[in-house]
């Protein structure tokens, strides 16, 4: 913050560089929250107990007291807390704005909710029915009704602005909706949303999602929300909030045991199985949807970074830009290094294995090691590659000790790995899944470095007829069988993937048991599935409008018009009942343009489901999207030429007068 210089530039003009007398921070500087932590430390330095506590975020400070009555809490705040706060403000030159100070009693005793007052800086602050803290609106009884109403209001405002956009494809609209609207609703949902109980809140929140989905698909307003969600492949609101809560809980369980959040987690685990009228809170209720044993087995991810002054454990980590260069450099490293070790990982029948191989000059295996990593639902190929590197370092250490001689010169060792992502994760360690393995690699490399061994990591392309890499690949494949022969704990990333799969399975069950969307279920029996995004994704709005009518059954045909009382009969111009199947396959009035449709779609004409991009067979989510899109395009051309899917209401006479 001292000895800082700056100049002012405008176009070609620039002032001389001058010393900044009062050097502050630029707005948005990442140093701001760090410096505020030091600045606020004396104010916030209070123990958090069952009697109360204090916390702060930048310039938002909040103090809470827990007592038998509102009167008792107010007395302690006025006599103990406010004098200390005012003394800190005088000492630091700060000023608390009394007009921005809020007081709220969190109690369900109606008589105490607006009781008493406090005086700060000579101004009286009375209790209010709500208080806003970091964007979350608290109410007396923590029922969060006001916060949900505010979230709905803000999200609806953004959704209305979204409706004003023009010339966007469905996939673009969907992306904007998920980037701009859902974060407004989801903000701090883990605080106010109970995944098992908030039916009233969800009923109101569902209305926020319905409007944008109608806009995305250009659908009729009578289409059910569940059908719109399946067609746009957008998670229902309650499942999206549940997934968010589960991911947050899983992430919290990876924090070190010394972290303060663990006291709340352990309390929530004890309260998880409460029976009766005991107080509930969202964390404990959300834990009911998860497996505690699986959570306790997860890896630990330390949010604090590594010390920046630590020496680099590797002499070099080289990731070449192209395969040819990497092959040449790998051959050079093999000829120049005293010790060369290859590591690789492989998957087979749902299990992962890793292996390490060292070859002699005759390309014979002199040292090898195999590791059973575990099942793929708890481990990933990326982490298996990291485990291979970890055991490769131990192999280097072992070979170096076997070759100990009187020559005490520094040795060079190279580990060749065919995973770029594993090398990059080792080069740039962070607080991500697999952190413990990366830290173990760095620690092992530091120990090897202490033995005067210059250790290098280098990328070698896989399947390039490299004897060492091929040998490691074979051994890794042989090690990929049930079991686990290492000490690392299961990954957060795989647990998140498992939770996501469970959410999708629940969505599928709800869709299959729903009373809505019968027409769509007959057409497409594999929903919900991601390929519907590709069906609609690149269509212009007028084409998406046609496809939605065909697939949902809510359209301009007579059958639909009669069901809503817009027509007295459901007859086609040919006299038969006018349905989607009748128009596409049977109506004699459209025989001419139907011949062109049959030529373009071929065998798909045998099934209305195939014509409309649906399927009742095959592997879910992996259809032949190219041929399916071609078929749908031909059907949309036919539907447009038939002129059956546009409003056939009589046009009114134009108003040529000057009046209303």
Where are the language model's segments positioned?
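Conserved pre-catalytic core of RNA-dependent polymerases
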Residues: 1-29, 65
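RNase H-like, metal-dependent ribonuclease domains
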Residues: 2-3, 106-122, 142, 164-178, ...
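Hydrophobic packing residues in well-ordered alpha-helices of helical domains and bundles
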Residues: 54, 74-78, 82, 96, ...
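Inter-domain linker/hinge segments that demarcate the starts of reverse transcriptase
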Residues: 73-93, 156, 328-331, 387-394, ...
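Short, conserved micro-motifs composed of acidic
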Residues: 13-15, 80-83, 87, 91-129
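Active-site palm subdomain of RNA-directed nucleic acid polymerases
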Residues: 33-68, 400-407
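Conserved pre-motif C helix in the palm subdomain of viral-like polymerases
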Residues: 21-50, 143, 171-174, 178
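Catalytic palm subdomain of template-directed nucleic-acid polymerases
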Residues: 24-25, 61-90, 108, 196, ...
């Amino acid at each position: 913050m001292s000895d800082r210089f700056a100049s002012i530039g405008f176009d070609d003009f620039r002032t001389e560089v001058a010393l900044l007398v009062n050097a502050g921070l630029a707005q948005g500087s990442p140093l701001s929250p760090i410096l505020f932590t030091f600045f606020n430390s004396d104010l916030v330095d209070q123990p958090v107990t069952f009697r109360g506590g204090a916390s702060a975020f930048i310039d938002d400070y909040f103090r809470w007291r827990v007592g038998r009555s509102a009167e008792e809490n107010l007395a302690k705040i006025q006599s103990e807390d406010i004098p200390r706060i005012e003394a800190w403000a005088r000492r630091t030159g700060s000023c608390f704005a009394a007009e921005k100070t809020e007081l709220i009693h969190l109690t369900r005793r109606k008589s105490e909710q607006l009781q008493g007052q406090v005086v700060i800086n000579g101004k009286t602050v009375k209790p209010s029915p709500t208080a806003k803290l970091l964007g979350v609106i608290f109410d007396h009884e923590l029922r969060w009704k006001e916060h949900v109403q505010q979230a709905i209001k803000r999200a609806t405002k953004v959704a209305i602005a979204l409706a004003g956009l023009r010339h966007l494809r469905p996939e673009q609209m969907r992306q904007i909706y998920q980037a701009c609207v859902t974060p407004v609703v989801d903000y701090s949902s883990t605080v106010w949303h109970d995944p098992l109980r908030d039916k009233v809140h969800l009923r109101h929140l569902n209305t926020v999602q319905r409007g944008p989905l109608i806009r995305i698909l250009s659908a009729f307003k009578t289409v059910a929300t569940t059908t719109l969600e399946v067609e746009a492949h957008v998670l229902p609101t309650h499942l999206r909030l549940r997934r968010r809560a589960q991911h947050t809980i899983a992430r919290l369980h990876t924090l070190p045991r010394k972290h303060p959040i663990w006291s709340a987690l352990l309390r929530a685990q004890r309260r998880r199985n409460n029976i009766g009228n005991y107080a509930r809170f969202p964390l404990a209720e959300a834990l009911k949807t998860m497996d505690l044993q699986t959570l306790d087995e997860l890896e630990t991810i330390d949010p604090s970074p590594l010390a920046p002054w630590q020496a680099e454990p590797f002499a070099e980590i080289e990731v070449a830009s192209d395969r040819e260069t990497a092959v040449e450099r790998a051959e050079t490293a093999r000829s120049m290094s005293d010790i060369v070790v290859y590591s690789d990982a492989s998957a087979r029948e749902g299990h992962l294995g890793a292996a390490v191989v060292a070859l002699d000059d005759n390309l014979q295996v002199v040292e090898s090691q195999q590791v059973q990593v575990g099942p793929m639902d708890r481990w990933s190929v990326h982490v298996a590659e990291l485990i291979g590197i970890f055991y490769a370092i131990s192999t280097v250490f072992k070979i170096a000790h076997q070759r100990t001689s009187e020559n005490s010169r520094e040795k060079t060792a190279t580990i060749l790995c065919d995973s770029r992502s594993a090398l990059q994760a080792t080069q740039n360690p962070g607080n991500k899944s697999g952190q413990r393995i990366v830290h173990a690699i760095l620690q092992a490399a530091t120990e090897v470095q202490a033995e005067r061994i210059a250790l290098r990591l280098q990328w070698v392309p896989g399947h390039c007829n490299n004897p060492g890499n091929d040998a490691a690949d074979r051994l890794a494949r042989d090690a990929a069988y049930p079991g686990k022969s290492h000490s690392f704990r299961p990954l957060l990333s795989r647990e998140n993937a498992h939770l996501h799969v469970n959410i999708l399975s629940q969505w599928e069950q709800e869709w299959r048991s729903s009373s809505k969307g019968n027409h769509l279920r007959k057409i497409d029996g594999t929903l919900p599935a991601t390929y519907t995004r590709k069906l609609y994704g690149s269509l212009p709005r007028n084409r998406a409008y046609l496809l939605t009518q065909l697939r949902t059954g809510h359209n301009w045909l007579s059958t639909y018009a009669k069901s809503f009382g817009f027509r007295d009969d459901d007859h086609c111009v040919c006299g038969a009942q006018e349905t989607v199947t009748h128009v596409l396959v049977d109506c004699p009035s459209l025989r001419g343009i139907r011949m062109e449709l049959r030529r373009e779609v071929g065998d798909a004409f045998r099934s209305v489901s195939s014509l409309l991009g649906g399927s009742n067979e095959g592997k879910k989510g992996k259809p032949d999207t190219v041929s399916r899109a071609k078929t749908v395009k031909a059907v949309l051309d036919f539907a447009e030429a038939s002129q059956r899917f546009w409003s056939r209401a009589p046009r009114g006479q134009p108003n040529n007068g000057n009046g209303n």
